[in-house]
Each structure stands twice: as C-alpha cells, then as structure tokens.
Amino acid sequence: MAASAVVPFVSVEEYLHSDPQPDVDYVDGVLEERLVGEIDHSALQGTLYASFLAHVKEWQIRVYIEARVQVAQTRFRIPDVCILPASWQLTQIVRQPPLLCLEVKSPSYTLKREMARAQDYLRMGVAAVWIFDPETRTAYVLRGDEMTEQREGVLRLAGTAIALDLVALFGVLDE
C-alpha cells in the first residue's frame, strides 16, 4: 500500500518571508501552486493589465499584476490582475477588498478550481470576480452567489465606470 504524501505545514510568517518563484497561494498552512507561463494566459493577462492601466485616471483606480491579497487570516491569493480604488492606502500586501479581481483560466485548471479561488475573494468583500477562459473565449462573472457567462459585448462593474470589451480582449489571441 502506497503511503500518502505528507504536505508540510507552513506558517503565515514563513509564507510572507519566503520568496517562491513563481509566487504561490497560501491556504490554511498549505502552499498551492499557480500555473503561469502559457502564451494565451500571458497575452490575456497583459492585455487586461494594459486595458485597465489606460484608464487609471478616468476610472480612479490602481492596477496590479499578481499582488498578494490577504483574503482571510490564514489565506492569501494572488489574482492575475487586481483592481483597487485610487484612494487605496499603499501597502505591500492587499488587505482591504479590491474592487475587482481578474483571473485567466489555465487549461489544466478546472472552472470549479477557479471558482473556489473566486469565492475567497467574494467572501473577503470583493464586489466581483471576472474569470477569463482563453480556450472557450468566455468570461465568467461572479457576484455573490451568482455567476453569469459572457462571450461578447462589454463587461461592466456595477457602480463604477469600469468597462471591458470582450471581442477586443479575446482578439489578442488571434494576433
């Protein structure tokens, strides 16, 4: 009978003072790998960042790539792109709810796995999480207990001027 692999417990302090490359999520003492490095993922992540960066003054936001977000006392997630209000007090770890967290789904991740990550953001108080699937060219919008799918048109964040054209976004995959 094969023995189960023992997953070492890592304290919050150890996690915060380590420098894993690439960075990993921290969930209740366990380090969770994040898949990065695929071209479609990189293209969408970069386009999302550039799209939001182009509107920081107009939308009164700050935009960060792969910033650590403390979603609970013993949980840290690293969204692909994180949108914060311009008034946010700069800290090295995001500890207040962002306006919006954006994730680009990797082919080896299931939508269920991405949604579990999204639930951490929503429980923290994030208004919405947008998950982008480059393979199906679908955006999944999560708000509270609600999830909608969108393949075209414009995604909007309620109560803000934030808007994102999906055809233009997914179009980078054709270039």
Give the residues covered by each predicted segment.
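Gly/Pro/Ser/Thr-rich low-complexity, intrinsically disordered segments predominantly at protein N-termini
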Residues: 1-175
